[in-house]
Amino acid sequence: MLLTRALFIFYVTVVALPAKANDEAYLYVLGVAQDAGYPQAGCYQAHCMPGWEDPSLRRGATSIALIDPAAKTKYLFEATPNLPAQLYALEKEAPSEDYTFDGVFLTHAHMGHYGGLMFLGHEAMGGKNIPVYAMPRMQSYLRSNGPWSQLVEFNNIALQPLAHNKAVTLAGVSVTPLLVPHRDEFSETVGYLIKGANKSALFIPDINKWSVWETEIAQIIQTVDYALLDATFYGDGELPGRDMSKVPHPLVTETMQALSGLSVEDRNKVWFIHMNHTNPLLNPDSEEANTVRANGFNIAVEGIRLPL
């Protein structure tokens, strides 16, 4: 995967959406990789080496921010192990002197989605009742297991309850958690439907195969303006020795096939995100990335804005 700095800059320029518009709420992409980021710890294979040798090619674990200029608030979706860098990126986009950091929405208890909560504790930021929105099992896990329980006991975070398909209203934006099937060892797993004044987004960074979800993914995409979808693995053969059909994620090739009947307009709503370090979509010049774009889909990169 021979990425170059120039190619990366070109690619971001091509896909970045329009700059901030007045007081319109928007989503801001902070990370696009699977839980362990790119390059992954301990990976010194050819596909990881560009990231070690050129820091500009590194990618953080998947996270998006909700920024509301009218309400002067900002929220995170996911607290990743890359939280320090992602908070800095958010600070540059929405400075704390102008925006209040009003909370974190969690999807589930896998390392790349909640591990960054540790930086809110007294050894680091020393947060003061930072709202953390979580489903019941996720809340119970945080309350009952250290070191997370200390965040609750020391009032670094203030757990906020969520319920399936029950909207949380945040000034001019609503956030609705949707239960999705996944490896739920420690908590439920949810995606989020995020609705602004004009547009809406579906955020599902982790899910098992689309066929085991009670919701038809093609149908829901027709009802939203953006769909940031699980793209952990691209296709067959990506993990040597593994039967990719049994990996509990929808392959990008499977998702494209499932959505092939949609109009080009609807396919344009899809932004693939949460890419494993093996995923060739991390290389914007790869044959696979070209195939995705040729079929009308998008590949998320850090720094894009999705106006709501």
Spell out what each predicted region is.
Residues 60, 67-133, 223-225:
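Active-site metal-binding motif and surrounding structural segment of the metallo-beta-lactamase
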Residues 198-200, 207-305:
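Cap/insert and terminal regions of metallo-dependent hydrolase folds
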Residues 14-18:
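N-terminal signal peptide c-region/cleavage motif recognized by signal peptidases
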Residues 104, 134, 202-203, 272:
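Structural beta-sheet core signal
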Residues 22-92, 96, 159-220, 304-308:
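Core dinuclear metal-dependent hydrolase active-site scaffold
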Residues 1-11:
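Sec-dependent signal peptide recognition
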Residues 137-146:
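A short, active-site helix/loop in glycosyltransferases that binds the activated sugar's phosphate group
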Residues 23, 128, 152-158, 171-173, ...:
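A short helix-to-beta-strand connector/capping loop
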